[in-house]
Amino acid sequence: MSSELTSKVDKEARKKAADTLRQVFVKLIEQINNSEPPTMEIPKRTLGNTIYDEKRKLLLLGEEKLKRSFFDLNESKRFMQTVLMASIIYDALINDEYPTIRDLYYRGKHSIILKDPRGKTYEENTWDEQKESDSVIMDIEVFTSLLREDMLILSKEKGKVVGDMRIRSGNDIIDLSKMGHGAYSIEPTPDLIDFVDINAEFVLVVEKDAVFQQLHRAGFWKQYKAILVTSAGQPDRATRRFVRRLNEELKLPVYILTDADPYGWYIYSVFRIGSISLSYESERLATPNAKFLGVSMTDIFGDSNKKPYLSEQERRNYIIKAKDADIKRATEIKNYQWFKTKAWQHEIEIFLNKKSKLEIEAMASKGLKFLAFQYIPEKIKSKDYIE
């Protein structure tokens, strides 16, 4: 790629990542020059080494580390994979390339053929499946404290955003209020986006892309001065980071709207406190003060303090019976430390008692105007959300 076409922020990010990779991995050469076994100490990416920081409301990686030595037969292949992947990423950085995680898998996949002193031939693949190379990339992230986005490694775009906002991406200014019926796809390197100007009072993140499209076409974000985002299901890293930046840098409150079921709750928790599998990223990806707007169990059934939004007839029409997997997942979530607040325990208890769930679309079935101009704004105004 011509350097003239590369933005200044891209060049700076590329240089920073390349310098960091070089500084970290050159230590292996120093160990060899000192006649020491080349060894890496990498933080463990395990459930047992994941902690919930009650004060910061984040899932974080603990302090346990594993030693990966080239001379340890149990670790030598993983050592080789780590060094190989780091070299491929480094080459891409210094050559102005933007590889995808799939590209990296193919670039590194080959067979290593060796002969022992007796002439016997051995053949070993660098990796067989992409999940192997993906895991190695994660190891490099925790080893270097560089996220793959920092290393300009691309992934498929998933999240979308629309609103009264201008951003700079590369050398272009993009107006997110002029997307027609479409929306801006959140790029896989959201830290390279500059916020130019914005006219909004809050961020609404919607789990379902279909509901996002309905709210967009209804003009919800225009009427209520909102930045409207969809994660299109489980959020990818880019969407989580983009939402975090909107909250942290622009001080916009964040509200999450999901289905009323355990999977919707978990999507909310991933946005708010991070995920167990990627706890090492939570400090940069999670939004600890994000609020669960709904759809809540009390929205459906009400309680002693609140009337339901659905009538008895509407409940019969829209409610879905929870499956065994839903019950099991709810029971698991109930025991997570970050769900042990009074409000969340109340929410989960209603679900387990009623054994019922509801999709966001049910609220739209009462009428799109009800969802966009009554349900959502009423809940925000009355602070009817769970934290």
UniProtKB/Swiss-Prot annotation:
The keyword DNA-binding applies. The keyword Ubl conjugation does not apply. One of its GO terms (molecular function) is DNA binding. GO terms for biological process: DNA topological change. Residues 12-160 form the Topo IIA-type catalytic domain. Its cofactor is Mg(2+). Mg(2+) binds at E207, D259. The active site is at Y106 (o-(5'-phospho-dna)-tyrosine intermediate). Keywords: ATP-binding, DNA-binding, Isomerase, Magnesium, Metal-binding, Nucleotide-binding, Topoisomerase. InterPro entries: Spo11/TopoVI_A, Spo11/TopoVI_A_N, Spo11/TopoVI_A_sf, Topo_VI_alpha, TopoVI_A, TOPRIM_Topo6A/Spo11, WH-like_DNA-bd_sf. CDD domains: TOPRIM_TopoIIB_SPO. It catalyses: ATP-dependent breakage, passage and rejoining of double-stranded DNA. Its EC number is 5.6.2.2. One of its GO terms (cellular component) is chromosome. It comes from the Archaea. Belongs to the TOP6A family. Homodimer. Heterotetramer of two Top6A and two Top6B chains. Relaxes both positive and negative superturns and exhibits a strong decatenase activity. This is Type 2 DNA topoisomerase 6 subunit A. It comes from Sulfurisphaera tokodaii (strain DSM 16993 / JCM 10545 / NBRC 100140 / 7). The lineage of its organism: Archaea, Thermoproteota, Thermoprotei, Sulfolobales, Sulfolobaceae. The gene is top6A.
